């Protein structure tokens, strides 16, 4: 039943201790209740591409949507609104009142560990995409939490790094998506970032709170990122409403003490408590499930399949290799991702999916009569693949004593289906969460004979035994790695010769986080601990490549599907380079292209760009991001023409990592990172410097052809902030297939005395057309279409002059032009 309470009455009658309790979570995912005043606890939940629920370990399966950059690549407001609605429904099923998403940080560099979570390098596209999803989610009565405000654009030293950025770049690039969200969606919550901006942690910077609440007139609940509160007095006085997670580290008795010293006023406490009560009241109006459960409805699966296929970008299609015919007699499926799809990046985005469709199965469905030749070709993992399908009868036992303690008492047992686990939010009656031990035991039955490599990484301590023989010691001596939000060890490797079909008893003896012998700073300690055990048959790399080349040569067509996965793109660390995994993938692709380029399709899976040294020799390249539950089906729908590709790159694709605008100023150096590229992020930089890219921002091909009228009619011809202009063009499908085109409107200020980008995205429309169909399309501008941030005046400025309207099918392919005039220079603040 939905609870009701009167906020004014509650504030007037509860104690200061109750008010203080409201200002932090009660645990990892819940706010603090006040039962005597009918104030309930409400649940928040990750993540950016799905609703995990309250459990990292033994969680309830969930819908996994495509990653943020994939969703941005749809350029489809309505489809993204429907995606938000699905996330709202998933929250209700998981008993959650608040979704901790979406993410709208900027991809300054292709190396950002969480770059895949955000929508685009362009602030306008990112803001519009985020607003669309928020509107959909909140239409279900679920509060959305836009994050991370602001400048959390890298993982390296993210809690300590000081982002040095000009006021202009801060406003035009990094704050702009949040501003669009505030104007168009007004979500109920905002999450602060871990980092500093220009000398002060955002979470305790009064200027940042004044910006959203006074300048923008938007007053959401503001919560910290998890363990992202660093002070009591400064953060409370600045405007932070809710410290997460609980139990509080900086509030509670510390606020009491600060109030006694009159360092925090009673009125400030009331303001913070009121905002939390408003949040709880709004959230608790929606009836959510009392127990966490899944949905997995047919209509949800259909929507996720559409999201996946509509995000996929056809980068190259020489000789019209695609779509592939369905009467193929023999097809080669090559690559690490054929049978193990990359459905999401790592960290907060990771969850237990309802299912994950594979490209192997999807191709078999599309070509039921074809002979399929499958080869791995080259591995793409950075850590050995987790053991799942070869694991049986696996459980984890929990103890308050180590394995050396005789007759220790088992406090509980959980069944498991994989050899990866995180205990950060795990609860068990009697278990000492500060210090505990567990034992995973299970049966491992290899499907091939030979030497098997096992890899074990841990946050805590762990040893691997096979048939009671110690194979890996990750307890005695530990070396820091990047796993588990940067708190884990590197992967320690052991090996054993195994026989196919024979069952081996595997055992992991695990000690919780506080047993670790490593000392790490600057990383979030989520507690509980975690471990990951992977395994792989040791194979000869050259033989794998040779087998892949032979399969491609023998087949009518070959599909290579490879790329990155959450080993390479994840919260907690940044990518070390822009290359594909350095285990022979490029060599394998080149070998196949040497003999079968004319009949080979290359499908890349990654959330951000990768180098493609073989791109000029490939005839057909498809980029499919991280596609969620329906990854395999979505890719197959494109490859066989069931869906006409309409995705457009949400990121520029540089040829080389050294070409990207943040190359010289990315990682934290001396505790700070200089945003030296200023406003020239992404295509703004490449165009300003004349730097060639492999594929431009907004690029994406189709199986049909569109004709656009070369003249864009702009009306009114005189642009004012109160009455912005619109551009009208005609577009016709002159090809033989139904399809969609994205008309991208860029505005240029060629005669401005102020340094400006060559052009900037200021509007777009996605248009669906049947063969022969023609439509008139209106693309609407807003008052910011001509403006920039004037650092001297501290206001937005629209300069008088003539502006060009450039309508393209990518940032490089301009197909229609127009112009308008601003006859008077104007300034303004706010939204």
Curated annotation (Swiss-Prot):
It is an enzyme of class 3 (hydrolase). It is found in: Secreted. Coiled coil: none annotated. It catalyses: Hydrolysis of terminal, non-reducing beta-D-glucosyl residues with release of beta-D-glucose. Pathway: Glycan metabolism; cellulose degradation. Its main location: secreted. GO terms for cellular component: extracellular region. Gene3D superfamilies: Galactose-binding domain-like (2.60.120.260), Glycoside hydrolase family 3 C-terminal domain (3.40.50.1700), Glycoside hydrolase, family 3, N-terminal domain (3.20.20.300), Immunoglobulins (2.60.40.10). The active site is at 225. One of its GO terms (biological process) is cellulose catabolic process. The keyword Secreted applies. Glycans are attached at residues 13, 474, 514, 604, 629, 726, 823. Keywords: Carbohydrate metabolism, Cellulose degradation, Glycoprotein, Glycosidase, Hydrolase, Polysaccharide degradation, Secreted. Residues 389-549 form the PA14 domain. Pfam families: Fn3-like, Glyco_hydro_3, Glyco_hydro_3_C, PA14. One of its GO terms (molecular function) is beta-glucosidase activity. InterPro entries: Cellulose_deg_GH3 (IPR050288), Fn3-like (IPR026891), Glyco_hydro_3_C (IPR002772), Glyco_hydro_3_C_sf (IPR036881), Glyco_hydro_3_N (IPR001764), Glyco_hydro_3_N_sf (IPR036962), Glycoside_hydrolase_SF (IPR017853), Ig-like_fold (IPR013783). Its EC number is 3.2.1.21. PROSITE patterns: PA14. Beta-glucosidases are one of a number of cellulolytic enzymes involved in the degradation of cellulosic biomass. Catalyzes the last step releasing glucose from the inhibitory cellobiose. This is Probable beta-glucosidase H.
């Amino acid at each position: 039943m939905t609870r009701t309470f009167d906020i004014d009455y509650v504030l007037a009658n509860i104690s200061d201790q109750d008010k203080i309790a409201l200002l932090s979570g009660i645990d990892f995912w819940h706010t603090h209740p006040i039962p005597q005043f009918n104030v309930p606890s409400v649940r928040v939940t990750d993540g950016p591409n799905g609703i995990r629920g309250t459990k990292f370990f033994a969680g309830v399966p969930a819908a996994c949507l495509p990653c943020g950059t994939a969703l941005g690549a749809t350029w489809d407001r309505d489809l993204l609104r429907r995606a938000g609605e699905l996330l709202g429904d998933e929250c209700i099923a998981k008993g959650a009142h608040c979704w901790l998403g979406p993410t709208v940080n900027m991809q300054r560099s292709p190396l950002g560990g969480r770059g895949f979570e955000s929508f685009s390098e362009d602030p306008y596209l990112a803001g519009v995409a985020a607003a669309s999803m928020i509107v959909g989610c909140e239409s279900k009565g679920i509060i959305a939490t836009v994050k991370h405000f602001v400048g959390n654009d890298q993982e390296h030293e993210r809690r300590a790094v000081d982002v040095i950025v000009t006021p202009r770049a801060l406003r035009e690039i990094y704050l702009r998506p949040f501003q669009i969200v505030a104007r168009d969606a007004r979500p109920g919550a905002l999450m602060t970032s871990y980092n500093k901006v220009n000398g002060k942690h955002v979470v305790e910077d009064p200027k940042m709170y004044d910006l959203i609440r006074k300048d923008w007139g938007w007053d959401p609940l503001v919560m910290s990122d998890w363990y992202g509160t660093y002070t009591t007095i400064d953060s409370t006085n600045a405007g932070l409403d809710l410290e997460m997670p609980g139990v509080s580290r900086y509030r509670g008795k510390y606020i009491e003490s600060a109030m006694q010293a009159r360092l925090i006023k009673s009125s400030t406490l009331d303001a913070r408590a009121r905002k939390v009560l408003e949040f709880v009241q709004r959230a608790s109006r929606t009836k959510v499930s009392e127990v966490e459960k899944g949905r997995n409805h047919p209509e949800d699966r259909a929507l996720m399949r559409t999201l996946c296929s509509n995000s996929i970008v056809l980068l190259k299609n020489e000789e019209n290799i695609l779509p592939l015919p369905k009467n193929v007699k023999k097809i080669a499926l090559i690559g690490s991702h054929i049978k193990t799809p990359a459905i999401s990046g790592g960290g907060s985005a990771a969850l237990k999916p309802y299912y994950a469709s594979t490209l192997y199965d999807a191709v078999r469905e599309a070509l039921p009569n074809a002979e399929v030749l499958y080869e791995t070709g080259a591995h793409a993992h950075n850590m050995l693949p987790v053991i799942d399908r070869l694991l049986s009868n696996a459980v984890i036992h929990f103890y308050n004593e180590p394995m050396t303690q005789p007759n220790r008492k088992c406090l509980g047992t959980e069944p498991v289906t994989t050899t990866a686990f995180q205990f950060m939010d795990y609860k068990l009656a009697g278990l000492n969460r500060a210090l505990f031990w567990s034992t995973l035991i299970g049966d491992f039955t290899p499907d091939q004979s030979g030497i098997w490599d096992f890899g074990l990484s841990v946050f805590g301590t762990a040893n691997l035994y096979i048939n009671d023989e110690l194979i890996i010691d990750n307890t005695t001596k530990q070396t820091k790695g990047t796993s588990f939000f940067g708190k884990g060890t590197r992967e320690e490797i052991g090996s054993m010769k195994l026989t196919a079909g024979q069952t081996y008893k595997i055992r992991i003896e695990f000690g919780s986080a506080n047993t670790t012998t490593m000392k790490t700073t600057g990383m979030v300690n989520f507690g509980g601990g975690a471990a990951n055990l992977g395994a792989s048959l040791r194979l000869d790399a050259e033989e794998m490549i040779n087998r892949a080349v032979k399969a491609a040569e023998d087949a009518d067509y070959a599909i290579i599907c490879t790329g990155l996965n959450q080993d390479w793109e994840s919260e907690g660390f940044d990518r070390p380079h822009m290359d594909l995994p350095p285990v022979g993938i490029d060599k394998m692709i080149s070998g196949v292209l040497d003999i079968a380029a004319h009949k080979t399709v290359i499908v890349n899976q990654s959330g951000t760009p990768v180098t493609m040294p073989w791109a000029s020799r490939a005839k057909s390249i498809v980029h499919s991001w991280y596609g969620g539950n329906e990854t395999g089906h979505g890719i197959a729908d494109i490859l066989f023409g069931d869906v006409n590709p309409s995705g457009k790159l949400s990121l520029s694709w540089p040829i080389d990592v050294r070409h990207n605008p943040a190359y010289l100023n990315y990682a934290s150096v001396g505790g700070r990172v200089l945003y030296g590229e200023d406003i020239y992020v992404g295509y703004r930089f490449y165009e300003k410097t004349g730097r060639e890219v492999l594929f431009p921002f907004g690029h994406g091909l189709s199986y049909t052809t569109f004709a656009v009228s070369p003249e864009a009619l702009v009306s009114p011809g005189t642009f004012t902030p109160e009455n912005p202009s619109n551009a009208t063009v005609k577009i016709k499908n002159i090809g033989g297939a139904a399809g969609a085109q994205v008309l991208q409107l860029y505005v240029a200020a060629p005669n401005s005395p102020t340094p400006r980008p060559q052009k900037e995205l200021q509007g777009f429309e996605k248009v669906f057309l049947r063969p022969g169909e023609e439509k008139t399309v209106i693309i609407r501008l807003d008052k910011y279409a001509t403006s920039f941030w004037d650092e001297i005046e501290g206001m937005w400025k629209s300069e008088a002059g003539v502006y060009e309207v450039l309508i393209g099918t990518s940032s490089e392919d301009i197909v229609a032009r127009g112009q308008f005039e601003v006859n008077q220079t104007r300034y303004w603040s706010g939204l």
